[in-house]
Amino acid sequence: MIRRKEDHIRFDKQIAGGPGLIHATQLLNEGEFHDKGRLFNIVRLGPGEAVGRHQHVGDMEVYHILKGQCRYDDNGTEVMLQAGDTAVCPDGEWHAVHNDGPGDMEMVCLILFK
C-alpha cells in the first residue's frame, strides 16, 4: 500500500490544554494498527505552541524530533530536545512538550498499547 502526500489526513487540535494547536499529519489511519497502537503522526508545533502535560495509561508514547528544538517534561523533569533526539513516555508516566524555539518544531509521534 502506498499513501501519497495528498492522501494523508491533516488536522489542527489543542492537546491536553497546551497553548496553541498541534498541526498533525496522520501516517496511519484508525484500523491500520492491528490492535497494537492508536497513533502514528508527524506533528508540527509553532513557536509558543505545546502539547500539555498528560499521563499515559495502558499505552506508551514515543516522540522523535525531526526539526527544531523543544522543552520536554519527562515525568516532572524538564530537558531540552533537538533534532535527532527521541523521548519515550512509558505506561503510567507523564509528559509534555513545548516549542520554546524561534521556529517550527516537527516530531514523529507514536502511541503503542501495553
Model-identified regions with their sequence ranges:
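Short acidic-glycine-tyrosine-enriched beta hairpin
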Residues: 77-91
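Short beta-strand His + acidic residue motifs that chelate non-heme Fe in jelly-roll/DSBH
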Residues: 52-53, 72-73, 89, 95-102
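Conserved short histidine dyad/triad with adjacent acidic residue
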Residues: 26-30, 41-57, 91
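A generic "binding-loop/recognition-motif" signal
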Residues: 47, 58, 77, 93-94, ...
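Glycine- and acidic-residue-biased ligand/ion/polar-headgroup-sensing regions
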Residues: 58-60, 64-70
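A short, N-terminal "cap"/entry segment at the start of jelly-roll beta-barrel domains
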Residues: 1-37
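Short, surface-exposed secondary-structure edge patches
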Residues: 42, 62, 76-80
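A short hydrophobic beta-strand segment most commonly corresponding to one strand
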Residues: 88, 103-114
